[in-house]
């Protein structure tokens, strides 16, 4: 047992933000689950790195190139196999909690980020191809992605809504989720197995703001924003309106803290884990952050501490003329562009 068990007891899941064939086949992922990791996230950048650096893909790439497939079909064949293998490793965890943990995420193509119908069609296809009950389909939280979320939830598909930086957009996502649940209930279908995480990105906010802020606010605003988003979450899912869905089996969306590796070496390497521990949340961490947290992190319910201070820090930031919602829109666009570039790089050797 490690500190991860203590975090789980506080109501937070720690997931690994990484996936590769070697990670699964070496038994390393299974070992991480024994330590207390209870889920996995992937994205185009993670697969691009895996395909480029993991020798276990070489034979399959060569074989797939002999087949009459598009580069994207070759990528999907390998990515789906990796997600299936990770789902198998995480299945015992998933079943031990009645299907509440042990999820593995696979993202739709970044080029679909502004196409709701295209996102729905690809998400359905990928979910069917994986064929595992603990698979989650990752969808960017653009307006189109939030529209797709509603449809996918009504289809009974679990979703990881990603690239959230905005509290306003996050609240829109909760409403879309509730509409999808209501539609499914109205059709007489079960909703208890559907889980959605809202992936709220942390370190990129401080990375964008720290050069413009006074010293006493540096490294504070991303955490303040997350704490405010958690207050929003508590209010939304504590409402009588959602309670009516909950009594019919609906699960609450969980906030997932993403981008929690520290980008600024001046900050403690476990800053974005230690500071954001709270019930009904997830933190997905890169390998280095996971190792650091197991070694010297602190398991304490920090997410509800300093809520007033967080609001004061956000107010001071606004008084400096910084609109965090405008920043959120820019950071989401930047994130989409990064994933598009990673996807292009990933596909290039598969031509």
Curated annotation (Swiss-Prot):
Its EC number is 2.2.1.2. It catalyses: D-sedoheptulose 7-phosphate + D-glyceraldehyde 3-phosphate = D-erythrose 4-phosphate + beta-D-fructose 6-phosphate. The active site is at residue 138. One of its GO terms (cellular component) is cytoplasm. Pathway: Carbohydrate degradation; pentose phosphate pathway; D-glyceraldehyde 3-phosphate and beta-D-fructose 6-phosphate from D-ribose 5-phosphate and D-xylulose 5-phosphate (non-oxidative stage): step 2/3. It is found in: Cytoplasm. It holds the Pfam family TAL_FSA. Belongs to the transaldolase family. Type 2 subfamily. Transaldolase is important for the balance of metabolites in the pentose-phosphate pathway. This is Transaldolase. The gene is tal.
């Amino acid at each position: 047992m490690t500190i991860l068990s203590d975090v789980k007891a506080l109501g937070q899941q720690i997931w690994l933000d990484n996936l590769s064939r070697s990670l699964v086949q070496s038994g390393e992922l299974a070992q991480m689950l024994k330590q207390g990791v209870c889920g996995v996230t992937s994205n185009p950048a993670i697969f691009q790195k895996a395909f480029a650096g993991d020798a276990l893909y070489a034979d399959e790439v060569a074989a797939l190139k002999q087949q009459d497939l598009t580069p994207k079909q070759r990528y999907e064949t390998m990515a789906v196999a990796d997600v299936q293998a990770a789902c198998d490793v995480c299945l015992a965890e998933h079943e031990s909690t009645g299907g509440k943990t042990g999820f593995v995420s696979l993202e739709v193509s970044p080029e679909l980020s502004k196409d709701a119908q295209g996102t729905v069609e690809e998400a359905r296809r990928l979910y069917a191809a994986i064929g595992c009950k603990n698979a989650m389909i990752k969808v960017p939280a653009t307006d189109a992605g939030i529209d797709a979320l509603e449809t996918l939830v009504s289809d009974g598909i679990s979703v990881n809504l990603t690239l959230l930086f905005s509290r306003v957009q996050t609240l829109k996502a909760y409403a879309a989720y509730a509409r999808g649940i209501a539609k499914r209930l109205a059709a007489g279908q079960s909703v208890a197995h559907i889980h959605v995480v809202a992936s709220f990105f942390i370190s990129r906010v401080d990375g964008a703001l720290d050069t413009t802020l006074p010293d006493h606010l540096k490294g504070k605003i991303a955490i303040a924003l997350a704490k405010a988003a958690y207050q929003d979450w508590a209010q939304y899912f504590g409402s009588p309106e959602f309670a009516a869905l909950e009594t019919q089996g609906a699960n609450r969306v969980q906030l997932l803290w993403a981008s929690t590796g520290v980008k600024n070496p001046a900050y403690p390497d476990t800053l974005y884990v230690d500071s954001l521990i709270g019930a009904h949340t997830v933190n997905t961490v890169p390998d280095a952050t996971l190792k650091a947290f197991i070694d010297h992190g602190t398991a304490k319910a920090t997410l509800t501490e300093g809520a007033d201070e967080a609001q004061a820090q956000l107010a001071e930031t606004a008084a400096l003329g910084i609109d965090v919602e405008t920043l959120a829109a820019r950071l989401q666009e930047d994130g989409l562009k990064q994933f598009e570039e990673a996807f292009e790089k990933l596909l290039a050797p598969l031509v």
